[in-house]
Regions:
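N-terminal flexible segment immediately upstream of the FAD-binding catalytic core
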Residues: 31-99, 109-140, 169, 192, ...
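N-terminal glycine-rich flavin-associated loop
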Residues: 48, 72-104, 122-168, 184-236, ...
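Flexible, glycine/charged-enriched surface loops at secondary-structure junctions
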Residues: 54-60, 107, 165-167, 241-262, ...
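A gly/ser-rich beta-alpha-beta helix-loop segment of oxidoreductase catalytic cores
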Residues: 72-73, 113-114, 118, 151, ...
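Flexible inter-domain linker/hinge segments
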Residues: 225-269, 550, 557-610, 616-633, ...
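Terminal amphipathic helices with adjacent charged low-complexity linkers/tails
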Residues: 295, 300-302, 333-444, 479, ...
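Iron-sulfur cluster-binding electron-transfer modules in prokaryotic oxidoreductases
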Residues: 560, 590, 676-926
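Ferredoxin-type iron-sulfur electron-transfer modules in oxidoreductases and energy-metabolism complexes
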Residues: 571-600, 609, 615-719, 828-835, ...
Length: 926
């Protein structure tokens, strides 16, 4: 029964401001909805709202759909979403859910790929407010809450020469809870430094609400009293596993390579202490056993010296044989010399237009190479190889050993290692560009799937070639294979449509053949990194066998006797669950020439959310695209007008009004999608020509100088009132006026008026300076620690550096257009930009002189629309042109550097940090 059809009116009002009262169309694709009584839901919400504020409980259509989306290709819509903020809340929620027999799913960042972070019941989010950490005095251990992002952990450890050992490709977006609970790994950590191997202790909340800290003696002692039978059963399972010699050997063998299929059985072999077993059972459990509220993990040494080489082989088998050989190389301490070996097949190379691949393609077409069929480009394979060391001398020895090893293989190009970051970063750019290139060029409406398997290293040459042939046999012409060859772990990208039964059948047949190849022939892993989820749940028993699977089921029954924790994940009785509940990806109708059209490339991975300013406040950039896709689908189908109207209404504030529109989300999006462009289009539709808002915007554009002049006396009046009344009285009066009349809220930091009077002094070098509208109009606030407005300081600095400052004509009327762009009045914005461009073109003598703008958001728009002049931001101009002309005396006080969104988008973060380091011995980025 759908939740919103059973709430009575009074409970609807308590649960949410926007509660839909009907189910529309085909919104919920859930294969298995749990039929629950009306009283269960009512009782759950009535009790939950006693300790969870209403604003953190979502039951409206909009936010349930938004929060019900993860990075995978399945969709379930939760009936209730709760954003948790503490362990006590989790404990009470789990006890409450258990008492009403309601299933619960946990979610952190939602970057998982196999359907393990979605729910059709209760979704508990543990992201924001779960970001605590502590580092041990020797920096070799770190304690983390589940909501802290992996990259943030690396930033915390970097000053100590340490790093977070698990290194999934999603580390810049994924949170620790998801990384540990999925045993997510990447290129370097392999099986020796994944979460299971570096975990020291865990703090968990069990299904009955009990909190256990396996690293705390008091907590352990209390648990021994309250859960004696639980511990006894853990010990019994341990002993039974060890007594089964065949099963023990199988567990050792399966975990000698990456494997996250099913529950983690390795703890029963590795540990005697039941508390250690409990802690490590959490790794890879995907929220099916307990809630993970804290982990303590070993940190890893971060090697300072690194070198990489891109190796090219004429066949994929030769490439794999070379990897097998390099895997055997060890240093004097027994450590592996090769730290990473990333294989890229020919389609991967073609997708990013790799220059060596293009050269190879040309050669085999014009003059075939020995042993290669004319025109056959399908063999070329690259292996991006990396080695690391503590010293330069050790690094040179490593390179020598690898080169000697490779001398026994025929490479297409000479082996060349580089230890220069500016060179090897280009290699890694090729590697990181594969996914966005393949996913971004997929056919409209198709889903980008990333499958994930692993083979034992000795099987690599044959297994890789067969996998390549298998994918081609099923007609996936644009699919490519790449991944962590050193660990036998490959990803293959499929651009898959689920729009017809035939396409679903094709995917099903592919996965059946993959299962046969990986399990039956090579006894590998069907999931090496991405979690079992729903995607591989039907195949867990098939891969592991009956004995191991029965142990997993016993563990599940022990931890979750009611079966309420993430049901359907890892354990699923439906053999077809992996081909049900596919996520629709309808097209948003946008002009193909519009920058906003890129949103249709979105794969909903969530990588954008770390940079989204409204994420955690209202909606994230990913969620906006999800919702606009659903709105577009409803508009196209026309079968649910009431639901469409509801979503459009609910979207207005969280989706539209609170989007910053600055495009910072595009910096972490693998496709480079700027969701702000979509927001601008939506706002444009809201303000058509002829509307009152558009007329007001057009009037402002046509009378810009007058509006700026009118603003100055208003600022002056506010400053006078502040002087007469004082801060306290002024704040009280203006707050009342704000509440009564809706006038802008006054603060003590309100600036005084500023009237800019340009003065030009002749000098040898020349620069065109366009002060932003804000800096032309607003001065300093009362009691400002700064003596001069920015414009005055900028002019003085330029003149001190020997520059003649030129100002464009009619500067009072000019604007970059950002104001109108942000409101969706794109035609007016472009008109204002054109006016500015013409004035700057004249002032710079047709681009002869550089142009400086002192506001980074303004400059960012100028750079994106004005191409024929060199435009600079102040820190960039100073560092580039004035650094050698001025004398810097660093102060011995900290300088906090705020890097704006626009500066980050323009790639100026390093520049302003470098400039700050010239000015202070302690430049800090908060």
């Amino acid at each position: 029964m759908h939740f919103n059809r059973i709430l009575n009116p009074s409970l609807r009002k308590c649960a949410s401001q926007h509660i839909p009262t009907r189910v529309y169309g085909n919104m919920h694709n859930s294969n298995k909805l749990y039929v629950m009584k009306q009283s269960n839901y009512m009782a759950f919400l009535q009790e939950a709202k006693q300790f969870i504020p209403q604003e953190r409980i979502y039951t409206d259509e909009l936010r349930r759909l938004a929060w019900g989306t993860d990075a995978g290709f399945y969709r379930l819509i939760p009936q209730i979403v709760i954003r948790s903020e503490g362990e006590e809340e989790i404990s009470r929620l789990l006890k409450l859910a258990g008492s009403h027999n309601l299933p619960v799913t946990f979610r952190a960042a939602g970057t998982s790929l196999s359907g393990q972070a979605i729910s059709d019941s209760i979704l508990i989010v543990a992201g924001k407010h779960w970001e605590g950490y502590s580092i041990s005095p020797d920096h070799e251990e770190i304690t983390l809450q589940p909501g802290i992002i992996g990259q943030r952990v690396n930033e915390l450890l970097a000053p100590f020469g340490r790093k977070f050992a698990p290194d999934p490709a999603s580390v810049k977006s994924a949170m620790v809870g998801g990384i540990v609970m999925n045993n997510a790994s990447g290129m370097n950590c392999g099986t020796h430094a994944n979460s299971d191997k570096v975990l020291l202790s865990a703090r968990i909340v069990l299904a009955d609400g009990t909190v256990l800290d396996t690293g705390d003696a008091v907590s352990r002692a209390a648990f021994e009293v309250t859960h004696r039978d639980f511990l006894r059963r853990i010990c019994t399972l341990r002993d039974e596993v060890r007594a089964d010699e065949k099963l023990s050997e199988r567990i050792h063998y399966k975990y000698s390579i990456k494997n996250v299929t099913g529950l983690n059985l390795l703890p029963f072999i590795r540990f005697d202490d039941p508390f250690d077993i409990i802690a490590h059972l959490m790794v890879g459990s995907e929220g099916t056993l307990a809630f993970l509220s804290q982990v303590t993990m070993k940190t890893e040494y971060d090697y300072p010296c690194k070198a990489s080489a891109m190796l090219y082989f004429k066949t994929i088998k030769d490439a794999c044989r070379a990897v097998v050989a390099m895997k055997k190389l060890t240093d004097n301490n027994g450590g592996w010399i090769v730290k990473g070996a990333e294989l890229l097949d020919w389609k991967s190379l073609a997708s990013v237009s790799d220059p060596i691949f293009l050269k190879y393609r040309g050669e085999i077409c014009s003059s075939p190479l020995p042993g290669i069929e004319p025109g056959d480009e399908t063999g070329l394979t690259a292996v991006l190889t990396e080695t690391k060391a503590r010293t330069d001398e050790e690094l040179k020895r490593n390179i020598g050993a690898i080169e000697h090893c490779l001398s026994h293989f025929r490479t297409y190009t000479p082996v060349r290692f580089t230890d220069k970051p500016e060179e090897y970063s280009q290699y890694w750019a090729i590697r990181s560009g594969i996914f966005p290139s393949v996913g971004g060029t997929r056919k409209p409406g198709t889903t980008c799937l990333i499958e994930d398997v692993a083979f034992h290293i000795e099987d690599l040459p044959e297994a890789t070639a067969e996998l390549q042939q298998l994918i081609a046999r099923h007609g996936y012409e644009d699919a490519c294979i790449y991944g962590h060859a050193l660990e036998g772990n490959y990803h293959f990208i499929l651009n898959q449509s689920f729009g017809s039964d035939a396409e679903v059948k094709r995917y099903e047949e592919l996965m059946n053949d993959v299962k046969t190849l990986v399990v039956d022939k090579y006894d590998g892993s069907l999931k090496a990194e991405h979690g079992t989820g729903r995607n591989m749940a039907p195949f867990v028993r098939y891969e592991w066998g009956d004995s191991a699977y029965e142990v997993m089921k016993a563990v599940k029954k022990l931890f979750d006797p009611q079966g309420l924790l993430n049901p359907g994940v890892i354990f699923n009785d439906d053999p077809k669950c992996h081909i049900k509940n596919f996520k629709p990806l309808p097209l948003i109708p946008l002009d193909a020439k519009s920058p906003a059209a890129k949103v249709n490339r979105c794969i909903e991975c969530g990588f954008c959310e770390v940079n989204c300013l409204s994420c955690g406040f209202t909606l994230s950039s990913r969620q906006r695209i999800v919702l606009q896709r659903e709105i577009a689908r409803l508009r196209q189908n026309g079968d649910a007008p009431e639901r469409l109207a509801l979503l459009e209404k609910q979207y207005l504030y969280p989706g539209n009004r609170t989007c910053a529109g600055d495009g910072l989300c595009s910096m972490s999006c693998p496709m480079g999608i700027n969701t702000g462009d979509l927001t601008h289009i939506i706002r444009q539709e809201e303000l058509p020509q002829g509307s009152l808002g558009y007329k007001a915007g057009n009037f402002a554009a046509n009378h810009f100088a007058g509006i700026k002049s009118a603003l100055r006396p208003i600022l002056g009046l506010a400053d006078l009132g502040h002087s007469i009344l004082g801060t306290k009285a002024m704040s009280s009066i203006t707050k009342g006026m704000h509440n009564a009349l809706g006038i802008p809220l006054w603060t003590p930091a309100m600036p005084k008026p500023y009237k800019f009077k340009p003065k030009e002094l002749k000098a040898g070098n020349k620069v065109v300076y366009f002060p932003s509208c804000i800096n032309q109009t607003m001065g300093l606030p009362k009691k400002s620690p700064v003596e001069q407005p920015l414009v005055n300081k900028m002019i003085a600095l330029l003149q001190k550096g020997g520059y003649e400052v030129i100002f464009p004509k009619n500067m009072e009327k000019l604007c970059c257009g950002t104001i109108w762009e942000s409101k969706g009045m794109l035609d007016i914005a472009n008109r204002k930009t054109a006016e500015l461009e013409a004035a700057l073109w004249e002032a710079s003598e047709e681009g002869k002189y550089p142009v400086l703008c002192d506001q980074s958001p303004c400059l960012h728009r100028m750079r994106s629309t004005i191409q024929k002049m060199k435009l600079y931001e102040p820190a960039e101009f100073i560092y580039t042109f004035l650094r050698d002309k001025l004398s810097f005396t660093p102060i011995d006080r900290p300088i906090a550097v705020h890097i704006t969104c626009s500066m980050r988008k323009m790639g100026l973060a390093d520049t302003i940090i470098a400039l700050a380091q010239l000015c202070s011995t302690k430049g800090i980025v908060p």
